[in-house]
């Protein structure tokens, strides 16, 4: 399989910014308590007019505009999310319908119901071989709609947002690691779970899982080049600052190479890596030809890791 070339990014954040001090008025917590344990200071929550779908559409449109491509140039679109506003039509379908050129667009579209942006890339392996053109990958979340605002263990962690990335196949090395723990589950409320928290999480177990998976180097043709010590920057799932710090120390890597933005956005699940990539691109921190080591160790028991170039 060829490597991937990142050609453009886009991002979108909700209009409402929620500070730790604001949360301290809702639950028994404080800015110092949250920041010291997670590194999070603020996060964005959707307003009544916003959703994971509207954010995804905005991020995808921005990526398209920056790439100079038209919707008809996109041969495949995949969206990763666990907080889509509707079971059907999918968020990916909604993105296609809202593009400027509505009668043309991806020949194949899907929404992956998972909180890991990185696992959405290899999931499309058959598409890469069938349509050797341009792919759009989106990660979007509106986790504020799934949280119990009275549950301190979750409401302080999660935020909303969306990021989009456009990739091409390229003759560059690649490295890939995928994994899942089918015996572990993240419980989310449904119609038959009245009175239960929409999202519940064993924070200590998630921490252990994230630390374990983040320390495993990618496997593939570019394994050596993909190691974090040899990459220009590592883009990890932005769940908790302490998780990244712990892994950087264990890997004996340079902390300056690992990008963090959870202090401003919290844990946006599937959106965290594409939002981070978009910020790096906007700041001019993705020089052409650089190797990237994006890692997703999500709150749910699946993970993916992919090395690519820009």
How should each PLM-predicted stretch be described?
Residues 40-42, 73-78, 97-111, 144-150, ...:
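Glycine/charged-rich beta-loop-alpha catalytic/anionic-binding loops adjacent to active sites
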Residues 6-8, 34, 63, 77, ...:
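Buried hydrophobic positions in well-ordered alpha/beta secondary-structure cores of metabolic enzymes
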Residues 59-75, 216-232, 280-285:
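Phosphate/pyrophosphate-binding loops at sites that engage ATP/ADP/AMP, CoA/4′-phosphopantetheine
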Residues 7, 80, 111, 135-141, ...:
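Short beta-strand segments
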Residues 1-48, 151-208, 212, 216, ...:
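Condensing-enzyme catalytic core mediating Claisen C-C bond formation in acyl metabolism
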Residues 22-24, 29, 54, 83-93, ...:
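A structural motif shared across PLP-dependent enzymes of the aminotransferase-like
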Residues 53, 57-60, 64, 83-84, ...:
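Claisen-condensing/thiolase-fold acyl-transfer catalytic domains that form or cleave C-C bonds
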Residues 125, 129-159:
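Flexible, glycine-rich active-site loops centered on histidine and acidic residues
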């Amino acid at each position: 399989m060829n490597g991937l070339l990142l050609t453009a990014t886009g991002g979108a954040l909700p209009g409402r910014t929620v500070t730790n001090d604001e949360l301290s008025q809702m639950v028994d917590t404080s800015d110092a308590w949250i920041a010291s344990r997670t590194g999070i200071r603020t996060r964005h929550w959707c307003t009544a007019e916003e959703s994971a779908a509207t954010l995804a559409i905005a991020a995808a449109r921005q990526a398209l505009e920056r790439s100079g491509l038209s919707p008809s140039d996109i041969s495949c679109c995949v969206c990763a999310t666990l907080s889509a506003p509707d079971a059907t039509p999918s968020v990916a379908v909604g993105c296609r319908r809202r593009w400027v050129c509505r009668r043309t667009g991806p020949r194949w579209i899907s929404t992956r119901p998972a909180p890991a942006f990185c696992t959405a890339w290899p999931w499309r392996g058959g598409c890469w071989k069938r349509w050797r053109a341009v792919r759009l990958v989106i990660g979007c979340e509106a986790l504020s709609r799934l949280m119990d605002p009275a549950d301190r263990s979750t409401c302080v962690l999660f935020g909303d947002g969306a990021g989009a990335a456009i990739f091409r196949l390229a003759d560059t090395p690649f490295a890939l690691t995928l994994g899942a723990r089918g015996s572990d589950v993240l419980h989310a409320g449904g119609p038959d779970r009245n009175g239960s928290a929409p999202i519940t999480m064993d924070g200590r177990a998630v921490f252990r899982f994230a630390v374990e998976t983040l320390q495993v180097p990618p496997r593939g043709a570019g394994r050596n080049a993909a190691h974090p010590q040899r990459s220009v920057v590592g883009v990890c799932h932005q769940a908790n600052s302490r998780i990244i710090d712990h892994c950087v120390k264990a890997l004996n890597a340079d902390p300056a190479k690992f990008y963090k933005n959870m202090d401003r956005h919290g844990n946006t699940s599937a959106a965290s890596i594409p939002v981070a990539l978009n910020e790096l691109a906007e700041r001019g921190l993705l020089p052409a030809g650089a190797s990237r080591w994006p890692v997703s160790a999500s709150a749910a028991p699946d993970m993916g890791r992919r090395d690519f170039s820009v």
